[in-house]
Amino acid sequence: MRWSMLVLLLLSCSQTFAQRPGDICPQNPHHGQDVTANTVPTVDPKLFNKRRYRSPRVLFSEHPPDSEPSRSRTKRKAGPPQHRGVYSVCESISHWEGNKTKATDITGNEVTVLPDVIINNSKKKQYFFETTCSSGRTGGSGCLGIDARHWNSYCTNSHTFVRALTSFKNLVAWRLIRINVACVCVLSRKSWRA
């Protein structure tokens, strides 16, 4: 008898989680209604107290941010730096992006990023802190400081996933979307056969 209750509980829990494609954004009392392009969803401010919805690369604000996101963790240093000059092999540009309309979510779907939301009765915009390769170094020119006689190299954007308010198939939800976070160097050894 106890095993059957446990199995029923397990089945009901797994069915509940299987039906959740994303964390549905609580809106007005008309929760299940279709979302049109003109509606701005209302978000409960208590949602931002949850750690899973906070990211230093995503910001909801009425005005564009002035500075880079604050770092929550600092690296420990044992002593003075051993190397005098530390240089990046790929030049990059970091900025707050406020006009993102489309993005790719973690399942590969192209979703619509909601530009505006209402939090505490004020309209706020979603901003994403992105780092991209400088246009001059992307592609065939190679990375800085790499020996071109022995190595093929190029700079490319690296990505991560952050939570954002999105719309997909008329359902507004928190989804993980891909944004650019770094410019990295890709190396391959040149063939010795010429």
Curated annotation (Swiss-Prot):
InterPro entries: Cystine-knot_cytokine (IPR029034), Nerve_growth_factor-like (IPR020408), Nerve_growth_factor-rel (IPR002072), Nerve_growth_factor_CS (IPR019846). Gene3D superfamilies: Cystine-knot cytokines. Its main location: secreted. Residues 1-18 form the signal peptide. One of its GO terms (molecular function) is nerve growth factor receptor binding. GO terms for cellular component: axon; dendrite; extracellular space; synaptic vesicle. GO terms for biological process: cell surface receptor protein tyrosine kinase signaling pathway; modulation of chemical synaptic transmission; negative regulation of neuron apoptotic process; nerve development; nerve growth factor signaling pathway; neuron projection morphogenesis. It is found in: Secreted. Glycans are attached at N99, N120. Belongs to the NGF-beta family. Nerve growth factor is important for the development and maintenance of the sympathetic and sensory nervous systems. It stimulates division and differentiation of sympathetic and embryonic sensory neurons. Homodimer. This is Nerve growth factor. It comes from Danio rerio. The lineage of its organism: Eukaryota, Metazoa, Chordata, Craniata, Vertebrata. The gene is ngf.
